[in-house]
């Protein structure tokens, strides 16, 4: 019997690169060799949607996207509020796996980390992984709003039935913040590469 797929979100981050033939590169992170799902593979950042990703608290920390607006983009989720959860999960998982966070202190510019903030947010990542803090609590504590309106819904894919671990994944595309750098956590991810879509 096929495994039931879990709801998940994936974020394809792009950056402008003048010397690239296509003009853009996309981010891939390498999954840890001991990961249960696709060990050692280069993938887009992403993971399972959690209940906390579509609570009222989650809606409050989103900029430019409400439960209703998310449902207009992604219909048919159960419960309906889960539509927003896909957006939040894409940002949260990218933060956990790549250290990049699409969020504002003051719009319209996505935050840039100072050296002190890099250290602080690295600690936050460890605390989120250990369930010491929720992602939403960190966002509120830092006075941030998630840049959910900068995520463009791109595709919906379900892992084939032959896989013992399956995901019902929504894919999003966004521009990578120019003043943040990828920091793999050595737990979920061990390396990264920016690569031309042609490859």
Residue ranges of model-derived segments:
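N-terminal leader/linker segments that precede catalytic domains of diphosphate-processing enzymes
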Residues: 1-199
């Amino acid at each position: 019997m096929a495994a039931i797929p879990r709801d998940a979100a994936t974020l394809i981050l792009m950056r402008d690169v003048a010397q690239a033939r296509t003009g853009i590169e996309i981010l891939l992170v390498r999954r840890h060799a001991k990961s249960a799902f696709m060990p050692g593979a280069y993938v887009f950042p992403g993971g399972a949607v959690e209940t906390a990703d579509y609570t009222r608290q989650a809606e409050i920390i989103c900029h430019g996207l409400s439960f209703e607006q998310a449902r207009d983009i992604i219909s048919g989720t159960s419960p309906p509020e889960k539509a927003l959860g896909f957006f939040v999960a894409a940002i949260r998982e990218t933060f956990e796996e790549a250290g990049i966070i699409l969020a504002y202190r003051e719009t319209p510019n996505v935050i840039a980390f100072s050296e002190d903030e890099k250290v602080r947010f690295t600690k936050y990542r460890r605390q989120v992984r250990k369930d010491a803090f929720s992602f939403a609590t960190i966002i509120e504590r830092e006075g941030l709003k998630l840049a959910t309106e900068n995520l463009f819904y791109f595709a919906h894919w379900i892992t084939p039935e032959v896989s013992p671990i399956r995901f019902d994944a929504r894919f999003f595309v966004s521009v990578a913040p120019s003043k943040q750098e990828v920091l793999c956590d050595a737990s979920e991810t061990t390396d990264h590469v920016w690569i031309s879509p042609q490859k």
